[in-house]
Every structure is written in C-alpha cells, then in structure tokens.
C-alpha cells in the first residue's frame, strides 16, 4: 500500500504570548546604578547630591528603548517593528506605536485631577480596578513592572498621602477643656526661655507666623528671603527653637498658648 507523506509545515498560532514575553523581558533586564548608602560618621564623599531624593528608586529604572513611556502609564507597551508584505512579496518596513491617549483622572487620595498620557489598555484596566488610586497601589509584581518611572512616583505620592490621612502627626494630641467650655488641642508642650508653654497650633502655623518676621529682618540688612529658602533653613529646626525665635522677634506667644 502506497503511503502519502505530506510535507511538514510550521503554522503560526494567533497568540500574543511571545510578544508579551518580549515586552516583559525588556523591563526585567533594565538595571539602575547602585546608590551608595551613607551612614552617620562616614567619610565625606567626593560628590555630594545637591538635594535630598524625593522618591525611592524604581527597581527597573528608565527605558532606553521607548523613552516616551517613561513619562506616562504605558503598561509595559513598546513600539513594535515589522514588515508589510505585498502580494508580490515586497517588504516595506513599518512600526506600530501603542494607542496612546491623554486623560485627566480624579484621585480621591490626592484630591486632585491627574493629567497623564496612557495607553487605551491601561485606561481600560484603571476602569476595571475602580480608579487610578487602586491601579497605582496594587501590590502584584506585574503591576509594579508596568507602572514605569512616572507611575512609580505617583504610587509613592498616593501611598504617602494615605499614610498621612490614616496617621496624622498629632493624632494622639491631648485635648483640654478651657474655662468657657471650649476645647483646645495641645500640639506641643515645650519650655521656652524657662517658661512652660502649651501650644495650640501646629508647626505649619508657627512657620507662617515666623516667615514675615524673618523676612523683615533680612530686608533690614539689605538681603532678600523667599519662602522656599525660608523652608530650607527651618526644615529641621525643632519646634522649641522656632518658638524661641518667635519670642526673640517680640511675638506674643500667649495668643497661641492655653
């Protein structure tokens, strides 16, 4: 009996698994330079950063292949290259860009609108997750990979703000009842120039009282002091010293004391 042997042919399956694997590989192989971990007492390095880092380092760094994805939520999508093949087998080089849209999405945690570029796929995922906050804060490793540098920074801001809301700085501050039945919260209990002071306002309010007084003092000697420089000067100053400084400027501390 004669057997008929058909030639072996490879058929291409209609699947995106190979494409997705290639995109994840482009993310996972990215690396960032190892940053030195400075400790108190270490020798002063030759290069000192000009300012403190505002965000933690993103594990997968920035993309050098599709750089515009570093400034939006692209979900790990990259530009794809290939060929258009005509009936005469002529190949024409072509590239396919992700479907990018610019949207303004409301963040409940940050209480503001976030305007950012994203792919249509990411926008659909955000709708499924129930908002951009849920999308950014999901703990899955795949979500961290697809966030990118910009998404990582937004995630840090959302998580930081959530922690501030859940754990305010004066959450356990004592509340006392005054003579007229009015209640007041004691933010600080300090001794200023030998006198005990129970302060009823927070640090931000104290800084707002001190800034115009410091600005006048700078102006008296022919110098200028803007608010940014003022915040840098007093960012790490203890509250006790801020109160002492206010008293040096003849500020009446009794107006903020109970």
UniProtKB/Swiss-Prot annotation:
Domain of life assignment: Eukaryota
Gene Ontology terms: cellular component: mitochondrial inner membrane; mitochondrial large ribosomal subunit; mitochondrion
Alphabetically ordered keywords of this record: Mitochondrion, Ribonucleoprotein, Ribosomal protein, Transit peptide
Presequence range in chain numbering: 1-21
SS bond list: none
Primary location recorded for the protein, binned into one broad class: mitochondrion
GO terms (BP aspect): mitochondrial translation
Pfam families: Ribosomal_L28
Molecular functions per Gene Ontology: structural constituent of ribosome
SUPFAM superfamilies per record: L28p-like (SSF143800)
Subcellular location: Mitochondrion
Subunit structure of this chain's protein: Component of the mitochondrial large ribosomal subunit (mt-LSU). Mature yeast 74S mitochondrial ribosomes consist of a small (37S) and a large (54S) subunit. The 37S small subunit contains a 15S ribosomal RNA (15S mt-rRNA) and 34 different proteins. The 54S large subunit contains a 21S rRNA (21S mt-rRNA) and 46 different proteins.
Role played: Component of the mitochondrial ribosome (mitoribosome), a dedicated translation machinery responsible for the synthesis of mitochondrial genome-encoded proteins, including at least some of the essential transmembrane subunits of the mitochondrial respiratory chain. The mitoribosomes are attached to the mitochondrial inner membrane and translation products are cotranslationally integrated into the membrane.
Family (UniProt): Belongs to the bacterial ribosomal protein bL28 family.
Note: Present with 4000 molecules/cell in log phase SD medium.
Protein name: Large ribosomal subunit protein bL28m
Gene: MRPL24
